[in-house]
Amino acid sequence: SDVYKRQLWYNALRFIADLVREGGNGLLADSLDAQAEVTGKSFVEVFRNEYGYLLDYVDGNMMDWSVRPNMIFTVAFDYSPLDRVQKKQVLDIVTKELLTPKGLRTLSPKSGGYNPNYVGPQIQRDYAYHQGTAWPWLMGFYMEAYLRIYKMSGISFVERQLIGLEDEMTSHCVGSLPELFDGNPPFKGRGAVSFAMNVAEILRILKLLSKYNL
């Protein structure tokens, strides 16, 4: 199973439990919370490894040890089966191996099969898409995760990260961001010249920052 799917399921259980509790159905809420407890414990046992990051995929004895950005959702979401120390370990490895000025790499340079350049024929570009190119929309969840861990002290870092994306607003499609970037310097913009999901995530982070700056 994919790590992000399991995290989405855990988050959904906790979210619905809170909703039904507010609606007055305490028994159902308690049942959902109990299921979430079991799910969360299993999540940590299955996906967290001795290096402090999360396996990207597990199916029986088959485990994907690649360092990929899907684990950042476990730190960014409202509900997580990880404790604060575990969340920080995940954030640290994402920062060290996946963070670029333009987004998060889809694969760490230290992992096998790394291909940061979205160039060449279609089949070659398709391979690079998930093997090392940087996706700006993932930066939104990364910055949200960073603020969850560091709170007010993380604001200046997040604001500096946004500068790297501001420069792109006049480089491709004015007022927008391209679909993706090469994972290595000079981080050239690639794909569609304007990608709504990227813009939406940056706007969401600006809104989140405004709450801290009140």
Where does each model-flagged region fall?
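TPR repeat positional signature
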Residues: R6, L13, M139, M143-Y146, ...
